[in-house]
Amino acid sequence: MAVDIQPACLGLYCGKTLLFKNGSSEIYGECGVCPRGQRTNAQKYCQPCTESPELYDWLYLGFMAMLPLVLHWFFIEWYSGKKSSSALFQHITALFECTMAAIITLLVSDPVGVLYIRSCRVLMLSDWYTMLYNPSPDYVTTVHCTHEAVYPLYTIVFVYYAFCLVLMMLLRPLLVKKIACGLGKSDRFKSIYAALYFFPILTVLQAVGGGLLYYAFPYIILVLSLVTLAVYMSASEIENCYDLLVRKKRLIVLFSHWLLHAYGIVSISRVDRLEHDLPLLALVPTPALFYLFTAKFTEPSRILSEGANGH
């Protein structure tokens, strides 16, 4: 195969785009930005992203997809009140919104119409921040080579959040207006108003810290799930197994946290060696068991009562 010989490209992410191919001859253009859906290879040629996402990539996308759902559930529970019968329907609606948004996002991504995506492999942290690596050969002129080297892991999250927001605005107000009769008029839509705040925050978080989240999300899941489980069990004054079993809601919260623990462990281990990594899942119930065994020494109910009395 004959390839035209040109000077090497400057910069970490500048590449040459294929202009013409005739049999065994390939003609490439000048160094510049690669088209969307391509990234540079070791020879500085722009190559299409044709690989399948790794398990870790899917786990990252799952984490980013879970964030709005968890926040929806939190604010629905926060504003619905203990006696509100609308909370369950809103929880189900939020799950439906996020699920449909994820499916639609996959369908509109390349290749269009299938629940499958093509991607470029993430090699290092700088792949997420190509705008920081535009070369300046003469220290005056900058060659702009910014492109999505981690295609589509960066932009697909924004598309998903957009569909989540659209579906929420189409479905949730009608549901809340119809069934949230136990709430005051000012409280009915507070969970929706909260979403209008946290979606922009999540968008900025992905835009600025997407690369950092990609490498840190397993540890974020483990730390937050451990902290929130301890806070919930303490606030609910759960000091033994009986306190845990008297209400179904407490069991649902416990199992949800166990799923998050397992998700974080699998993400950290990446299940590279299945027979060695699966036993790690036996650690999932350990934090809850440790709390129950040590609660009698700390007496969280006494601490809460003293805090409420201002002592």
Swiss-Prot record:
GO biological process assignments: ERAD pathway; response to unfolded protein
Keywords: Endoplasmic reticulum, Glycoprotein, Membrane, Transmembrane, Transmembrane helix, Ubl conjugation, Unfolded protein response
Post-translational changes noted in the entry: Ubiquitinated by RNF5 via 'Lys-63'-linked ubiquitin linkage in a UBE2N-dependent manner. Ubiquitination decreases association with components of the proteasome and ERAD.
Residue numbers on the Cytoplasmic membrane side: 79-87, 171-188, 232-250, 299-311
Main location per the UniProt record: endoplasmic reticulum
Pfam families from the UniProt entry: JAMP (PF05571)
Signal peptide: none
Lumenal face of the membrane: 1-57, 109-149, 210, 272-277
Localization annotation: Endoplasmic reticulum membrane
Protein's membrane topology: Multi-pass membrane protein
Function: Regulates the duration of MAPK8 activity in response to various stress stimuli. Facilitates degradation of misfolded endoplasmic reticulum (ER) proteins through the recruitment of components of the proteasome and endoplasmic reticulum-associated degradation (ERAD) system.
Protein name: JNK1/MAPK8-associated membrane protein
Source organism: Mus musculus (Mouse)
